């Protein structure tokens, strides 16, 4: 059976931390599905198409990924795509409590899907899409935190 993992997130924008986790996870699974969540409660910074384009460009050297968007329960999306694992990144201990609760709920909703927590490479431990947006809003340089595809897109937009 093909080992498939879903790595969900808003990826608004994708960061070097996301890229690092995906590259490392791609060595553990036959396929990684990058699931871009469409959360109607959050105001998106980038469109879904822009996120797909920047992710595609940032990960062009990884052959075992697919990028899809979804607007359903994560476990339903994972089941639909025949994924056995949900990947979650833990940047800090403060992330753990929420992620642990979420994994328990997901396990209750679908006992066949496991959650795998991955910690970041140290240099990416403090990066988040929210912080990137704040740096952009204040006119700061984000080039060390995001792939070139994100920097290029934002340079032409802002």
Swiss-Prot record:
<feature type="binding site">
    <location>
        <position position="18"/>
    </location>
    <ligand>
        <name>ATP</name>
    </ligand>
</feature>
<keyword id="KW-0547">Nucleotide-binding</keyword>
<dbReference type="InterPro" id="IPR004821">
    <property type="entry name" value="Cyt_trans-like"/>
</dbReference>
<comment type="similarity">
    <text>Belongs to the bacterial CoaD family.</text>
</comment>
<dbReference type="GO" id="GO:0004595">
    <property type="term" value="F:pantetheine-phosphate adenylyltransferase activity"/>
</dbReference>
<feature type="binding site">
    <location>
        <position position="88"/>
    </location>
    <ligand>
        <name>substrate</name>
    </ligand>
</feature>
<keyword id="KW-0808">Transferase</keyword>
<feature type="site" description="Transition state stabilizer">
    <location>
        <position position="18"/>
    </location>
</feature>
<keyword id="KW-0173">Coenzyme A biosynthesis</keyword>
<keyword id="KW-0460">Magnesium</keyword>
<dbReference type="InterPro" id="IPR001980">
    <property type="entry name" value="PPAT"/>
</dbReference>
<feature type="binding site">
    <location>
        <position position="99"/>
    </location>
    <ligand>
        <name>ATP</name>
    </ligand>
</feature>
<keyword id="KW-0963">Cytoplasm</keyword>
<feature type="binding site">
    <location>
        <begin position="124"/>
        <end position="130"/>
    </location>
    <ligand>
        <name>ATP</name>
    </ligand>
</feature>
<dbReference type="GO" id="GO:0015937">
    <property type="term" value="P:coenzyme A biosynthetic process"/>
</dbReference>
<keyword id="KW-0067">ATP-binding</keyword>
<feature type="binding site">
    <location>
        <begin position="10"/>
        <end position="11"/>
    </location>
    <ligand>
        <name>ATP</name>
    </ligand>
</feature>
<dbReference type="InterPro" id="IPR014729">
    <property type="entry name" value="Rossmann-like_a/b/a_fold"/>
</dbReference>
<feature type="binding site">
    <location>
        <position position="42"/>
    </location>
    <ligand>
        <name>substrate</name>
    </ligand>
</feature>
<comment type="function">
    <text>Reversibly transfers an adenylyl group from ATP to 4'-phosphopantetheine, yielding dephospho-CoA (dPCoA) and pyrophosphate.</text>
</comment>
<comment type="subunit">
    <text>Homohexamer.</text>
</comment>
<keyword id="KW-0548">Nucleotidyltransferase</keyword>
<comment type="pathway">
    <text>Cofactor biosynthesis; coenzyme A biosynthesis; CoA from (R)-pantothenate: step 4/5.</text>
</comment>
<feature type="binding site">
    <location>
        <begin position="89"/>
        <end position="91"/>
    </location>
    <ligand>
        <name>ATP</name>
    </ligand>
</feature>
<feature type="binding site">
    <location>
        <position position="74"/>
    </location>
    <ligand>
        <name>substrate</name>
    </ligand>
</feature>
<dbReference type="Pfam" id="PF01467">
    <property type="entry name" value="CTP_transf_like"/>
</dbReference>
<dbReference type="GO" id="GO:0005524">
    <property type="term" value="F:ATP binding"/>
</dbReference>
<protein>
    <recommendedName>
        <fullName>Phosphopantetheine adenylyltransferase</fullName>
        <ecNumber>2.7.7.3</ecNumber>
    </recommendedName>
</protein>
<dbReference type="GO" id="GO:0005737">
    <property type="term" value="C:cytoplasm"/>
</dbReference>
<feature type="binding site">
    <location>
        <position position="10"/>
    </location>
    <ligand>
        <name>substrate</name>
    </ligand>
</feature>
């Amino acid at each position: 059976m093909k080992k498939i993992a879903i790595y969900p997130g808003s990826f608004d924008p994708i960061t070097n931390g996301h890229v690092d986790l995906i590259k490392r996870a791609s060595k553990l699974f036959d396929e990684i599905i990058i699931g871009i969540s469409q959360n109607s409660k959050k105001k998106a910074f980038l469109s879904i198409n822009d996120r797909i384009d920047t992710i595609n460009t940032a990960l062009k050297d990884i052959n075992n990924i697919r990028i899809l968007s979804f607007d359903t329960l994560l476990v339903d999306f994972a089941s639909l795509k025949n994924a056995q694992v949900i990947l979650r990144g833990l940047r800090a201990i403060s992330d753990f409590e929420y992620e642990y609760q979420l994994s328990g709920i997901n396990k209750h909703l679908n006992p066949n899907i496991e959650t795998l927590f991955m910690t970041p490479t140290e240099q990416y431990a403090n990066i988040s899409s929210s912080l990137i947006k704040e740096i952009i809003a204040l006119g700061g340089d984000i080039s060390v935190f995001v792939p070139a595809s994100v920097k290029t897109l934002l340079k032409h937009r802002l």
